[in-house]
Structures are given as structure tokens and as C-alpha cells.
Amino acid sequence: TRSGGACNSHNQCCDDFCSTATSTCV
């Protein structure tokens, strides 16, 4: 899985959790 990428418009990441604080995948 990838981390650190931007979340999409639905605040979702492909395989990771979206950090709403930084709007990035964690």
C-alpha cells in the first residue's frame, strides 16, 4: 500500500486510511 499520497474527493485512499488533518493517506 502507498502512504503519504493525497486523499481523493471522497476522503478515501485506495488501501490506506485518510488523515483528515493533513488530507493525506496514512
Curated annotation (Swiss-Prot):
Superkingdom, natural source: Eukaryota
Transmembrane segments: none
Tissue: Expressed by the venom duct.
Signal peptide boundaries: none
GO cellular component: extracellular region
Record carries keyword Transport: no
Localization per record: Secreted
Cysteine pairings via disulfide bonds: C7-C18, C13-C25
Sample GO molecular function, one term: toxin activity
UniProt keyword annotations, A-Z: Disulfide bond, Knottin, Secreted, Toxin
Other notes: This peptide corresponds to allele E1l. Has not been merged with other alleles since they may differ due to geographic variation (see strain in PubMed:19606224).
Name the record gives this protein: Conotoxin Eb6.15
Natural source organism: Conus ebraeus
